[in-house]
Structure formats: C-alpha cells, structure tokens
Design a protein with these regions (language model features):
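Short, solvent-exposed loop/turn elements at beta->coil junctions and helix N-caps
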Residues: 77, 122-126
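Short conserved micro-motifs at the rims of enzyme active sites and ligand-binding pockets
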Residues: 12-14, 100, 147-149
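Active-site C-terminal subdomain of aminotransferase-like
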Residues: 1-86, 92-97
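Short glycine/proline-enriched loop/turn "hinge" motifs that connect secondary-structure elements
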Residues: 31-34, 125-130
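Generic non-transmembrane alpha-helical segments
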Residues: 66, 70-74, 107-117, 153-164
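Conserved PLP-binding catalytic core of the aspartate aminotransferase-like
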Residues: 77-118, 138-140, 144, 182-183
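PLP-dependent enzyme catalytic core of the Aspartate aminotransferase-like
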Residues: 128-187
Length: 187
C-alpha cells in the first residue's frame, strides 16, 4: 500500500518502540511478512541438514546460557529471567546497586560500543518505562572466546564505572526521571 503522505496513514497501523537507542516507528499490516527470511531459513536447512542446523542452535544456546550465568553472577546485575529458552537474554541493574550507582546501563552500552560490541540498552514499554534493560542476542558464529571477550569488556567497564567520583550525565538524567535513549547504532 502507498499513502499520499503521512496524514493519510491510520495511526492504529504504526507501532513505536525504543530500539537500539532510537525511537523506531514501524508500519505494517497484521500477519503480513516478507518471504525472504523464510527462503533464507529454507536454504540453510537444506544446505546444513537437520543435524547441522541443530548443532548451530545448540552452540548458540550454550553460549547464551554461559553469558547469562556469568552476567547474573556479577553483583551489579540481575537477569530478567532464570532460564534461557532462546539464544538471547535480558538483564538490568540490581535494584539495590542502582540506588547508589554513579552510572546507568546507557553508559555501559556506550563503553561496550567503544570496544566494538553492539549491546543495546533501552527502556521497557509503556507503564514500565522506568525500567532499563540490556539485551544480548547470540547469533550463529559467536564462539566461547568471543563470549569471554565480551564478558571481560563488561567487567572492565563496570570496574571503571565503580571508580567514578561523580555521576555520569545519564545517571543525572535518571535521577531527574528524564527519558533517555542510548546512542543510536549505525550499521
């Protein structure tokens, strides 16, 4: 469908979300999807076979569980869920830690981005937007060595943040209850 301009677009068809550091608005018809992803998955399934595809997914899950466990063991973080059922997981700052921290997850996002990692920090949807989380999606090709490098970069960033004498700008915004966005990722 094509609309002459934005004013003709029914507001009910658009959905906005704070994603990867920017407000993203998406328009779509319910239950409509492009076929390219389905074709790509079909190709991979034919090329790799069930066992190959299964091995890739098992590796992704293993790495996700490992990262989930290690991040959850850090005193400043709290995992959103106890189990990892997909190769992704979400965590936030531990409530007690957050009360006295001089930094926010937006600062951690920026620090990780300087090390080459794209780990988004974002607020949750309406009615719980005061909660900020970070998310890791473990994709095909992420190795245990890469996971260890990411975990080391997270630990190093937290260690640097804990040396701060004064709060960061994002922490001051958090205290003032101002809406925040992480730095926008460019691909």
């Amino acid at each position: 469908m094509i609309w002459r301009d934005k004013s003709y677009l029914p507001e009910e068809m658009s959905f906005s979300v704070n994603y990867l550091g920017a407000e993203v608005t998406q328009v779509g018809l319910n239950f409509s999807r492009p076929a390219a992803q389905v074709l790509g998955q079909y190709y991979n399934f034919i090329r790799l076979g069930w066992e190959g595809y299964h091995d890739i997914q098992n590796n992704s899950m293993e790495i996700a569980r490992y990262c989930h466990e290690r991040i959850g063991a850090m005193a400043c973080f709290e995992n959103y869920s106890k189990d990892v059922v997909n190769p992704l997981f979400v965590w936030s700052l531990n409530e007690e830690y957050e009360r006295t921290a001089k930094w926010t997850l937006y600062d951690l996002q920026a620090a990780l981005q300087q090390s080459g990692w794209m780990v988004p920090a974002y607020s949750l949807p309406k009615d719980i937007e005061d909660i900020t989380v970070m998310r890791i999606v473990v994709r095909q090709g992420m190795s245990r060595d890469m996971a260890d490098m990411l975990l080391k970069d997270i630990a190093n960033a937290v260690a640097e943040f804990e040396k701060l004498q004064y709060p960061t700008q994002s922490r001051l915004q958090w205290e003032a209850q101002e809406k925040q966005h992480g730095k926008v990722f460019t691909h």
